[in-house]
Amino acid sequence: MSRVLRLGVNIDHVATIRNARGGDHPDPLRAAKIAAEAGADGITAHLREDRRHIGDRDIARLRDEIDLPLNLEMAATAEMLAIALRHRPHAACIVPEKREERTTEGGLDVVGGAVHLAPIITALGEAGVRVSLFIEPDLRQLDAARALGAPVVELHTGAYCDAAAGPAREAQFLRIDKAARHAQALGLECHAGHGLTYDTVEPVAALPAIAELNIGHFLIGEAIFVGLHQAIARMRAHMDAALRGGVAA
């Protein structure tokens, strides 16, 4: 396997469970350490404006106490920019955010939001934070991301994962494939994530232009039944099988 495909584990919903009753258990930091042992290459955490799961203290602890790179998902706001500049995570993924949504529902409108996004991308980059933009697999959005100087894009895989197996899912997969190849041609590093499961991850993992997958909700849910280490290790096995062109055990 000459190609390297990184796995970023999103631990937001460990904090969701903790916050359901308050207190400190389960601890996202402990989850991050288990993820590292299970084969994760990085930790992703989304500090939402309403702090519904991950909190400010979590970001500080993850940045200071975990050896793996931290990918901070953040809205394009002055508050979140200040937090990112204070903690200086390895990477920051700018995502759209609406208070009424249960989870991130779609990609950024980079085409329409270029004026707002440009200074945020510049400030993060100058601070040594690697910036990615969470976008739909849309060529116009990719072109706009490149024009803004973002080094990384993350393709939203939600429509692909939500589609029924068969022609509908295949059509969504082809969009991801085309977008990933376009990103690579533009010189962008291409990541993907949102909604990926054991059943949907391998085709995306097999795409040569994809460098990283970020997966969270499914892994935390699966951990209820098999434990977090096993849930993550199995996802890593599916990704490795895709790189080999085989099938995970």
UniProtKB/Swiss-Prot annotation:
<feature type="active site" description="Proton acceptor">
    <location>
        <position position="46"/>
    </location>
</feature>
<feature type="binding site">
    <location>
        <begin position="216"/>
        <end position="217"/>
    </location>
    <ligand>
        <name>3-amino-2-oxopropyl phosphate</name>
    </ligand>
</feature>
<dbReference type="GO" id="GO:0033856">
    <property type="term" value="F:pyridoxine 5'-phosphate synthase activity"/>
</dbReference>
<dbReference type="InterPro" id="IPR013785">
    <property type="entry name" value="Aldolase_TIM"/>
</dbReference>
<feature type="binding site">
    <location>
        <position position="21"/>
    </location>
    <ligand>
        <name>3-amino-2-oxopropyl phosphate</name>
    </ligand>
</feature>
<feature type="binding site">
    <location>
        <position position="53"/>
    </location>
    <ligand>
        <name>1-deoxy-D-xylulose 5-phosphate</name>
    </ligand>
</feature>
<feature type="binding site">
    <location>
        <position position="48"/>
    </location>
    <ligand>
        <name>1-deoxy-D-xylulose 5-phosphate</name>
    </ligand>
</feature>
<feature type="binding site">
    <location>
        <position position="103"/>
    </location>
    <ligand>
        <name>1-deoxy-D-xylulose 5-phosphate</name>
    </ligand>
</feature>
<protein>
    <recommendedName>
        <fullName>Pyridoxine 5'-phosphate synthase</fullName>
        <ecNumber>2.6.99.2</ecNumber>
    </recommendedName>
</protein>
<comment type="pathway">
    <text>Cofactor biosynthesis; pyridoxine 5'-phosphate biosynthesis; pyridoxine 5'-phosphate from D-erythrose 4-phosphate: step 5/5.</text>
</comment>
<comment type="subunit">
    <text>Homooctamer; tetramer of dimers.</text>
</comment>
<feature type="binding site">
    <location>
        <position position="195"/>
    </location>
    <ligand>
        <name>3-amino-2-oxopropyl phosphate</name>
    </ligand>
</feature>
<feature type="active site" description="Proton acceptor">
    <location>
        <position position="73"/>
    </location>
</feature>
<feature type="site" description="Transition state stabilizer">
    <location>
        <position position="154"/>
    </location>
</feature>
<dbReference type="GO" id="GO:0005829">
    <property type="term" value="C:cytosol"/>
</dbReference>
<feature type="active site" description="Proton donor">
    <location>
        <position position="194"/>
    </location>
</feature>
<keyword id="KW-0808">Transferase</keyword>
<dbReference type="InterPro" id="IPR036130">
    <property type="entry name" value="Pyridoxine-5'_phos_synth"/>
</dbReference>
<keyword id="KW-0664">Pyridoxine biosynthesis</keyword>
<comment type="similarity">
    <text>Belongs to the PNP synthase family.</text>
</comment>
<feature type="binding site">
    <location>
        <position position="10"/>
    </location>
    <ligand>
        <name>3-amino-2-oxopropyl phosphate</name>
    </ligand>
</feature>
<dbReference type="Pfam" id="PF03740">
    <property type="entry name" value="PdxJ"/>
</dbReference>
<dbReference type="GO" id="GO:0008615">
    <property type="term" value="P:pyridoxine biosynthetic process"/>
</dbReference>
<dbReference type="InterPro" id="IPR004569">
    <property type="entry name" value="PyrdxlP_synth_PdxJ"/>
</dbReference>
<keyword id="KW-0963">Cytoplasm</keyword>
<feature type="binding site">
    <location>
        <begin position="12"/>
        <end position="13"/>
    </location>
    <ligand>
        <name>1-deoxy-D-xylulose 5-phosphate</name>
    </ligand>
</feature>
<comment type="function">
    <text>Catalyzes the complicated ring closure reaction between the two acyclic compounds 1-deoxy-D-xylulose-5-phosphate (DXP) and 3-amino-2-oxopropyl phosphate (1-amino-acetone-3-phosphate or AAP) to form pyridoxine 5'-phosphate (PNP) and inorganic phosphate.</text>
</comment>
